[in-house]
Regions:
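Short, acidic/small-residue loops that bind anionic groups at enzyme active sites
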Residues: 124-148, 155-161, 296
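ATP/NTP phosphate-donor binding region
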Residues: 23-104
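ATP/nucleoside-binding phosphotransfer catalytic cores, i.e., glycine-rich phosphate-binding loops
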Residues: 267-335
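Internal helical hairpin/lid segments
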Residues: 224-282
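Conserved beta-alpha junction segments in alpha/beta enzyme cores
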Residues: 41, 51, 55-59, 63, ...
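Positively charged n-region of N-terminal signal peptides that target proteins for export
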Residues: 1-8
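Conserved anion/nucleotide-ligand pocket segment
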Residues: 155-219
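Hydrophobic h-region of N-terminal signal peptides that target proteins for export
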Residues: 14-21
């Protein structure tokens, strides 16, 4: 070591924490895709299950165009040749990658969930979105894509998908919430009081989605972790209640609940085996794990397999407030 370096070494040691802090701050930032503007184009793909026969793509196009947007459908989004999936893995991955790479497409919306998104992860390059970010939208099985985007620190939208839009002449608050999220209008969602709510106020980045998909990602590159202040969103459909308990046990035993700042519990719809398990609903099972945490918990949040299913920004800093009058989830305007 030269004499100059010997003199500089103590100074560098003193400055090291400052550089580390600056690096940590930069790495903590999430990339926020640009909000949509009238005249923009959205791409619709089917990364998982094939569409129901009753799906009316013409009405879906008309609905989205009424928002002032243009629509591109993936080449295989309506394929029905496979027993379950909307095309082969290669076809679905190619559709998704084309929409991700198309500079004219400002948001990529999953047509529906089901199962199959995880099969595309080895075949697509989501990292390109760090250079040219755009919104990825969906819920349920699409949670796997959200988890992958979280690892890349890119915000995404957990929300309704076109296959679930209503065309019965009545208002469709789910679809309207998606429009609001795409155009950057979602600021705060208020929820009615729930007997299992836990009071308090806390902030963190919103993460999560479908509970089964979250647990299935354990041990993979997409595994959900909470090293930073995190607000966990969970929802589920069609599961036996004992499996909900098993998954909550796994979250607790793996330490994934320890660093949470708040929990937002969406709808647990069409639950099975409740009488046999001795509970009135899945919320009672979840509450047994969240209550000892001593953090704000919101039950009955309108997200998941429910109507309305409101769109929320994953990766966004949120503030959760819960009291006797209800609950509020506020989305930060700046990162």
């Amino acid at each position: 070591m030269t004499q100059t370096m010997k003199h500089l070494f103590p100074i560098l040691l003193l400055l090291a924490p400052l550089f580390a802090g600056a690096q940590g701050a930069d790495s903590a930032a999430f990339i926020r895709p640009p909000y949509l503007q009238p005249g923009d184009t959205v791409g619709i793909v089917s990364p998982a299950g094939k569409l129901p026969l009753k799906t009316d793509t013409a009405k879906i196009r008309e609905r989205i165009e009424s928002w002032g947007l243009h629509v591109k459908f993936g080449a295989h989004c309506a394929d029905r040749e496979q027993p379950y999936f909307a095309g082969t893995d290669a076809e679905r991955a190619a559709d998704l990658q084309r929409m991700l790479d198309d500079p004219s497409v400002k948001a990529v919306i999953a047509f529906r969930g089901g199962y199959g998104s995880v099969r595309l992860l080895p075949l697509v390059d989501l990292a390109r979105l760090r250079e040219h970010p755009k919104w990825v939208v969906g819920f349920s099985d699409i949670t796997m894509l959200h988890l992958a985007l979280r690892k890349l620190r890119i915000e995404s939208i957990h929300g309704p998908m076109p296959a679930g839009f209503h065309f019965d002449g009545k208002e469709d608050p789910s679809a309207e919430s998606l429009r609001q999220a795409l155009f950057g209008e979602t600021v705060c969602i208020e929820v009615e009081p729930h007997p299992l709510n836990q009071p308090g106020t806390a902030s963190g980045r919103l993460a999560g989605g479908n509970l089964t998909v979250i647990r299935s990602a354990d041990g993979t590159p997409e595994e959900l972790t909470a090293e930073e202040p995190t607000v966990l969103l969970i929802e589920e459909v069609g599961e036996f209640v004992y499996r909900i308990d098993r998954m909550m046990q796994s979250l607790a035993r793996s330490g994934k609940l320890e660093n949470l700042r708040a929990v937002v519990v969406g709808h647990f719809s069409e639950m099975l085996g409740m009488e046999k398990f001795g509970v009135a609903d899945a919320c009672a099972v979840i509450s047994a794990y969240t209550r000892p945490l001593g953090i704000p918990v919101v039950f009955g949040f309108p997200a998941g397999h429910t109507d309305p299913n409101l769109a929320v920004y994953l990766g966004r800093r949120v503030t959760v407030g819960v009291d006797d009058t209800g609950a509020r989830v506020e989305f930060a305007r700046e990162d």
